[in-house]
């Protein structure tokens, strides 16, 4: 369940939100997605572009629980096809957001928006 109060994703809009869990950390300052080739992830990006054409506001949320990082990027060396489709989706108007989360026994709480690095 996501509470979207005061966020970039207004509840009144027709939003579609794809959530990706980010676990890859190769550089101590940058979280990355994907950690393996993801044909399914690429398919989802294409569906979000189609949803945009049908009047929806599509978002992809990259969420990580890796503490101390302030940056995120697509691991294009792992899945170049996903990276290319990410760029197409972004240019088409799909919105991409990345957040660092705090994890506890009771909840996962969004802590901070982090930068998305496009290489």
Residue ranges and their predicted role:
Residues 1-6, 10-11:
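Single conserved hydrophobic/aromatic residue that forms the stacking wall/gate
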Residues 7-8, 40-44:
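N-terminal-biased segments
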Residues 12-14, 55, 98-103:
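Surface segments flanking catalytic/ligand-binding clefts of nucleic-acid enzymes
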Residues 16-18:
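Short hydrophobic-acidic sequence motifs that mark active-site Asp/Glu residues
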Residues 20, 26-39, 46-78, 100:
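Nucleic-acid nuclease catalytic cores
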Residues 44-47, 85:
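A general structural detector for well-ordered alpha-helical segments in enzyme core domains, enriched
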Residues 65-119:
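Domain-level recognition of nuclease-like catalytic cores that cleave nucleotide substrates
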